Amino acid sequence: MSLDKITATDQVAAITKYNTMPSDEMAIHGTYHAICYSIDGFIKWDEPIQNLVTTVGKNLTLDTILGNSAAGAVVMGLKGVGSANVADTQASHAGWLEVGGTNAPAYSGNRPTPSFSSAAAASKATSSAVSFSMTSTGTVAGCFINIGGSATKDSTTGTLFSAGDFSSSKSVINGDTIAVTYTATLT
């Protein structure tokens, strides 16, 4: 009688993960696009800028969407020299000042109210540019959006939703017009 020997050399390994959850993260980003036209209609400068969304702006977004709260009117303004910070509020932004009213350069009228198109592909954009008609000479360093506050320049009411800085400060003179669009995107 013969004996067959069997030697097992194959190995099997398996790993099982339990309690795994899909990751679903969301971030909000925005872009301003500012174009300065001379009194003759020529482009003096053209700058797209990434903005930051402030902490109070993110909180307002959550409260509005999930808390059944009304956001309020949206207005846009211009900022002077100094960097925006996520901790900035409309009442307290120590790194910069709003321009247009007390701080030069001045522009005519109140803070303009942008119109927005319907959201699509996780983005919401202005349907047309808002215009700032400059009435004096000075330096502009960026843009901001206020929600639920006053359209009056230098008002500290409402929520500072976002602010963005140009790559460098921009000079303007009386007769210049700054046209600004904005797009917010959720990723």
Indicate residue ranges for each PLM-predicted region.
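Small cysteine-rich, disulfide-bonded extracellular modules of the LU/uPAR three-finger superfamily
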Residues: 1-142, 147-187
